[in-house]
């Protein structure tokens, strides 16, 4: 279905009964074709991590159950899920009577797997679960004194490197893009790990800032950055992790890596989550 038929950016009525058909799928192939990515031979591995903070249903006695969900959608899934549709879908459980949170978890995982055409994993945690906060372990490049005048579209010519080999992690809290459909701001922290020729921090920060007024879905921004870096520098290893802040009770954190046996970033939340 075309994106224009989705519920994103439209006034919607919340349904009071569970409805899996609310989930709206978006084929990944469309944006990947634009980026020159062969969907049959992806240049990366990874996952989209969805953290959902507004999950509730009713138990057999009519008492509300609540939880926080984390779901992992493989980067090689055929489709992504449009976030507004996922929010409406989750809220359709609000008056749904169910045996337990575990049963709700099973239903959500199955529905997400059905719509993405991939095996989605994850779980729903109790609200009283202790969550640790932290900061990325790498070098923050935000304090560089740079002049910026390009806020979109992204300018990959700004990705420059020095003739020195490094293995490092850098990050920025200044990343921002906009929703492809509504234009609403998506704020995030981006973490880059790589091994190869050293990125020039000042020009690379300007590159990241050139996404500021650019309209693109979160997952697609991560893949664009991955491809732009990969095409600019011959690296032995590269991973991209964007931790977006929540909107509508959901935050989306795409992770892409050249390493097939990648290890997911630690589960510490950032302060803006």
From Swiss-Prot:
Gene Ontology biological-process entries: queuosine biosynthetic process; tRNA modification
Known role: Catalyzes the NADPH-dependent reduction of 7-cyano-7-deazaguanine (preQ0) to 7-aminomethyl-7-deazaguanine (preQ1).
GO terms assigned for molecular function: preQ1 synthase activity
InterPro entries: GTP-CH-I_C/QueF, NADPH_dep_7-cyano-7-deazaG_red, QueF, QueF_N, QueF_type2
Active-site residues, as the UniProt record annotates them: 179, 186
Subunit structure: Homodimer.
NCBIfam families the UniProt entry points to: QueF
Organism of this sequence: Rickettsia prowazekii (strain Madrid E)
Protein name (Swiss-Prot/TrEMBL): NADPH-dependent 7-cyano-7-deazaguanine reductase
UniProt similarity note: Belongs to the GTP cyclohydrolase I family. QueF type 2 subfamily.
Pathway the protein takes part in: tRNA modification; tRNA-queuosine biosynthesis
Pfam families: QueF, QueF_N
